[in-house]
Amino acid sequence: WADDEVKPLGLPRAIAKEFAQVVSSEMTIAADGGPRADFINEQLTRFQSNVQNSIELCMALGGMAFKPYVSGGNVFIDSTSAASFIPLRFDDGDNCVSGVFKSQPVKVDKSYFVKLEYHDFTDGVYTIRNKAFTSDENGITGSEVELGRVPEWAAIPEEVQIKNVEKPLFGYFTPPVSNNIDTASSLGVSIYGGATEDLI
């Protein structure tokens, strides 16, 4: 519908960006209690300096999962938007305790591969299952195959269980608006959900 005479205002992006600026500028995360706390604060400072883009995506798409990982002796936090994270289960407090992280497609020869990483927290046991899928067409999950079909996934275990865990090892964040599209769902919606046609 857009042409030389009719141009979109771009309000959805502007709204998401404005909310992200407010959230990230007022965000404070701190730990105290010695050398370990100092290390945590150092890692969190790096995360906070880059978090605005992630929050902007969260506001636009309706959700974001944050998952920490270790690399080179430092802790990094992977931000996964609603396009690549599927919440599967919520506890009585509406906290996401199970979900699936979908990797970016990897092309090997003429085939595309994606890795689905299932995370589940049940009764103090945290389970991670890794599965690989392949398709000849990009964007299609396809059929399940062995993880080893992709060289960089070959060393990843198919399943890991961690016991005596108090909470999920990821966080699921949604915009502070009610889901007016599916009122029975715990999933988040865009900050401008329900008004998309009026805003474009």
Regions found by a protein language model. Give the residues of each.
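Extended, helix-rich architectural segments
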Residues: 1-91, 95-96, 107
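Structured, contiguous alpha/beta core segments that scaffold functional sites
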Residues: 56-63, 67-200
